[in-house]
Amino acid sequence: ISEIKGERQGVITMIYDHGQRGLLTTLADIQHDFMSIIQASLHSHVTHDRCLEVILVRGDGSQIKTLVEQLMSHKGVESVKLTTISVQD
C-alpha cells in the first residue's frame, strides 16, 4: 500500500474463505478495534466457501492503512483492495 496521508474517505473490498477456522472471529475483532474509522460494512455470500465484504472508512490515512494491513495478514483472506480520496479542501 502506498503512503496514505491526511483525512481520507474510502472503501475496502475483501474476499475471504469463510470456512477458514477462526477467521470470522478474527476479522470481526479487527473491525471492532477500528470502529472509530469504520462507517459501515456490507457482507455478501459469493459462493458456499467465499464471502465478499465491503467496508466504508473515514479517518486518518495511517489508521486506514493499518486496518488494511491487519485484514490482509490472515490465512484465508484472498484479496483486500483499498480505494480512498482526500476529504481535505
Residue ranges and their predicted role:
Residues 1-89:
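Long, contiguous binding/interaction regions
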